[in-house]
Amino acid sequence: MSQNITLIKDKILSDNYFTLRNITYDLTRRNGKVIRHKREVYDRGNGATILLYNSTKKTVVLVRQFRVATWVNGNEDGMLIETCAGLLDNDEPEVCIRKEAIEETGYDVGEVRKIFELYMSPGGVTELIHFFIAEYRDSERASTGGGVEDEDIEVLELPFSRALEMARSGEIRDGKTVLLLNYLHMSHLMG
């Protein structure tokens, strides 16, 4: 028997930036028993992320920026090293990630390859992230990057081996970045 869901109540608690909803629903379990649940769900839209790599130089491009949620949760300076990423904002995932790559890193990359799409925190966040990789070349640098007006993004070109070590040691603590670095390592695209 499949699980059946009956929506009882969907109340918007806040929609100042994204939407926080309180959802009440009945869930029919596999054994037929109906259980009522009440959960808060944060809807921030879907996103995309990309890891830029250079197989000749054996480097990757990451960014460092302030993330308030990490600061609230004990990251002393709130800075996070991560892959370039952004919300889709009604764009197709590849269109979004190309725009974000130029804005954040300055690279106008050629071919991009979609790897997978994942829910990163499905217990309470609706966001589905589309994961990409792309090889970059120095000649594809269209600008210095750094983000748009209200962003302060530092562009980091790192040896791939160093980035992997940073992920292993906990210096890189962003889930999407650790996933993409490990994907690149397992795929042997860096030789």
From Swiss-Prot:
Its cofactor is Mg(2+). Mg(2+) 2 binds at E100, E104, E151. GO terms for molecular function: hydrolase activity, acting on acid anhydrides, in phosphorus-containing anhydrides; metal ion binding. A motif (Nudix box) lies at residues 86-106. Mg(2+) 1 binds at A85, E104. It catalyses: GDP-alpha-D-mannose + H2O = alpha-D-mannose 1-phosphate + GMP + 2 H(+). GO terms for cellular component: cytosol. Homodimer. This is GDP-mannose pyrophosphatase. It comes from Salmonella arizonae (strain ATCC BAA-731 / CDC346-86 / RSK2980). The gene is nudK.
